[in-house]
Amino acid sequence: MTASTATETLLHKGSGLQVVVGLGQSGLSVAHYLAEQGYQVAVTDNQENPALANKLPATIDIRQFGAIDAELLQQAARIIISPGISLDNVAIAAARAANIPVVSDIQLFCEACTVPIVAITGSNAKSTVTTLVGQMAADAGINVGVGGNIGVPALSLLSNKEMELAVIELSSFQLETVTNLGAQVATVLNMSPDHLDRHGDMLGYHQAKHRIFQGAKSVVINREDALTRPLVSDSLPRLSTGIHAPNKGHYGLITDTAGQTYLARGTERLISADKLKIKGRHNLLNAQAALALGELAGLPLEIMLITLQQFAGLEHRCQYVSTVAGIDYFNDSKGTNIGSTMAAVEGLGAVYAPKDGKLLLILGGQGKGQQFGELSPFINQYVSQVLFIGEDGKQIEQHLRAAGLSDEVSLHQCQTLENAFATIEQVTASSLSQVQAVLLSPACASFDQFDGFVARGEHFSQLVKQLDVVS
């Protein structure tokens, strides 16, 4: 362990020492914020030489690296924990047992923020909806800050003194230490199993997510997912979203006699789904969520609809790549859990099913102990070919077969994306092929073969472009 000041000389907790645990981007933002506020700050991190240590303010000379310093934590007036640090960490648990407050950067942000907050969480689509709402606000001429789990630390937004609205994406890790967020509008977009190794079970995960509703002035609810419904007063303003025709004032979908689907608010048809650049039923829910959040934040509907029509989605999130030889290719490399892949398969599958089209699905990577059999009903309905890649490809195939995968679905062990594309050319060359779209939505982490989901998605897109050149 390295330290520029011995633990024995540190201040006692009654004197206001603020200890930042974890020196990632959020921890660094906390350190700068607290130092600027005039606090005495200490930083501790498990890494011996944290990459961001040289970016700490010079005034912070208490730096305990190599392990989280339990003795240092016991001397804190307040501990600010980074999202990657579990509350079950021995040193953190001991500090909490000693009644030392443990909070996150989000707690500091909501206490300091003086503008309305749009708070967004969910198992999937958080970044898409957060980005979309932020763009809607910007297009409406509002000075908006967008941050949180989306890559920009929330505290850094406070440097914009002209900010009129904050739109923040929140993870369950960030929320588990937040009390009374007080958002102008809050939502849990959807809920599916994720991070259970951290939260223990779905109950713990659900409880963490729903902390977003504490102190909220209004809420948005997904009618299709009972787990998103908050336990809040019936008098609290709320809007809901769903895949069916909505009640008056709420959002949903209306399909006319010709089979055309529209985003709707009550009986009012707002925009045809065909006019949107983002595709799939799940993206229609995302679009509704953004509209509902924007409405409760005071954004004008006409501006939001213009933004929505222009919005092309985010990279690696059901991103349309190209059409080659009549087949559409979609990059959903960010789909690193089964819930995300379910949404992508169902969402895109419903687009091609009316045209008797099927999906070719690329699955695999590091499975994280998930039960992939839950994908079988979705694959049976919308997929004709499954190509497996990565270290857990064979295990995923076993899960699907054991869960009643249809014999009509062809399975291929490909190991790599290069092999997968060779297989794609073979299976789609047949005149009997029903494949109208290829979807990379691995439902797995990527670190067995790539530096991350971005690298995996970029490689997929490059292989598609090579196909395009050849064709």
Curated annotation (Swiss-Prot):
It catalyses: UDP-N-acetyl-alpha-D-muramoyl-L-alanine + D-glutamate + ATP = UDP-N-acetyl-alpha-D-muramoyl-L-alanyl-D-glutamate + ADP + phosphate + H(+). This is UDP-N-acetylmuramoylalanine--D-glutamate ligase. It comes from the Bacteria. The keyword Amino-acid biosynthesis does not apply. One of its GO terms (molecular function) is UDP-N-acetylmuramoylalanine-D-glutamate ligase activity. Belongs to the MurCDEF family. It is found in: Cytoplasm. Pathway: Cell wall biogenesis; peptidoglycan biosynthesis. Its main location: cytoplasm. Its EC number is 6.3.2.9. InterPro entries: Mur-like_cat_sf, Mur_ligase_C, Mur_ligase_C_dom_sf, Mur_ligase_cen, MurD. GO terms for biological process: cell division; cell wall organization; peptidoglycan biosynthetic process; regulation of cell shape. Keywords: ATP-binding, Cell cycle, Cell division, Cell shape, Cell wall biogenesis/degradation, Cytoplasm, Ligase, Nucleotide-binding, Peptidoglycan synthesis. ATP binds at residues 122-128. It is an enzyme of class 6 (ligase). GO terms for cellular component: cytoplasm. Cell wall formation. Catalyzes the addition of glutamate to the nucleotide precursor UDP-N-acetylmuramoyl-L-alanine (UMA).
